[in-house]
Regions:
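Internal alpha-helical scaffold of NAD(P)-dependent oxidoreductase catalytic cores
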Residues: 32, 86-87, 110-119, 128-233
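N-terminal glycine-rich dinucleotide-binding loop that anchors FAD/FMN and/or NAD(P) in oxidoreductases
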Residues: 38-55, 186
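Rossmann-like NAD(P)(H) cofactor-binding subdomain of soluble oxidoreductases
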Residues: 47-132
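NAD(P)-dependent Rossmann-like dehydrogenase/reductase catalytic/cofactor-binding core
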Residues: 163, 214-300
Length: 300
């Protein structure tokens, strides 16, 4: 559900490997996929065309799925989940590839906690034009797992399908921590690149912006730890070192959306840190600043 950069990439890889995948799309993207198929462009791996492709704008026409890959924008989570609820069977699994750490709380309230597996996607993609997903680099990693930390028949089955499709998939025994590990870096990357209108390179080189990057992540770690997530106290230091090793041109989807005049997910990124921090009594002034600066672009 959601055939943009993330959903289109993972769904396309699975479909190309022979899995029975139905894409849900709308507008020009839907029309292009119906006429031309789904094209995944990658300068390194080569292009992949999925044609014919099963695509619809009516989820009910897809029947009862074994798995719902949930990849819509965060503000659509509740409405889309309620739309999909009638087609979910008693054994339908739900795996969200969205950003943030509160998505599964929303989904669990609609599908039931037992339906959920937690997931984290590591990939650089966007829709370059209708029917076409552009993938940057070779990274297409997906870490997922059951919330009880145990292996299950459905997680093992999905792992096998993902690996067959060439996706760098792995099972996590502490998916909540895995979600917060990605969230910590994403909060820093998105908050700095979008608010400063630049890529990670200049951010990490300037002492003031480097400190701001670190503090954004430090606040996220403090909130996560207060919520009981098993993050090391110095995890922000680790993520800052990680930031030093990524390409200077690395950017965030939040900044990409800002440049293109799209609605922003800042309410669930920096804003999420602020709201969760308020619940557990952790001050988050840097994330509050990012949220305040970008809030007008987050509401259309």
């Amino acid at each position: 559900m959601g055939s943009g950069g993330v959903g289109g990439l993972y769904g396309g890889r699975l479909a190309s490997a022979g899995c029975d995948v139905t894409f849900v799309a709308r507008g020009a993207h839907l029309a292009a996929m119906r006429e031309h198929g789904l094209l995944i462009e990658n300068a390194t791996l080569g292009d992949t065309l999925v044609k014919p492709v099963k695509v619809t704008d009516d989820p009910a026409s897809a029947g009862t799925p074994d798995l719902i890959l949930f990849a819509v924008k965060l503000w659509d989570t509740e409405a889309v989940a309620k739309l999909l609820k009638p087609i979910a069977g008693p054994h339908t699994a739900v795996l969200s590839l969205q950003n943030g750490v509160v998505k599964d709380d929303i989904l669990g309230g609609i599908f039931g906690a037992s339906a959920l597996m937690g997931g984290v996607a590591y990939v650089g993609t966007h829709i370059s034009r209708p029917g076409v997903i552009n993938q940057v680099g070779t990274l297409q990693r997906l870490v997922f797992g059951e919330y009880d930390g145990k292996k299950s028949a459905r997680s093992e089955q999905l792992l096998a399908a993902l690996l067959k499709a060439g996706i760098q998939a792995e099972l996590s025994t502490d998916i909540r921590r895995t979600l917060w590990e990605k969230y910590t870096f994403l909060v820093g990357l998105s908050g700095t690149t979008a608010s400063m209108r630049t890529t990670i390179g200049p951010v990490r080189e300037n002492p003031q912006t480097r400190a701001f990057l670190h503090d954004l992540m430090k606040e996220a770690v403090a909130v996560g730890r207060a919520l009981g997530v098993a993050l090391p106290e110095d995890y922000a230091d680790d993520r800052l070192k990680f930031a030093d090793g990524v390409p200077a041109t690395m950017d965030s989807s939040l900044h990409h959306d800002l440049k293109n005049g799209n609605r922003l997910e800042v309410e669930w990124l920096a804003g999420g840190v602020v709201r969760l921090g308020q619940k557990v009594g952790v001050a988050t002034p840097c994330n509050r600043a990012v949220w305040d600066v970008l809030v007008l672009a987050s509401h259309f």
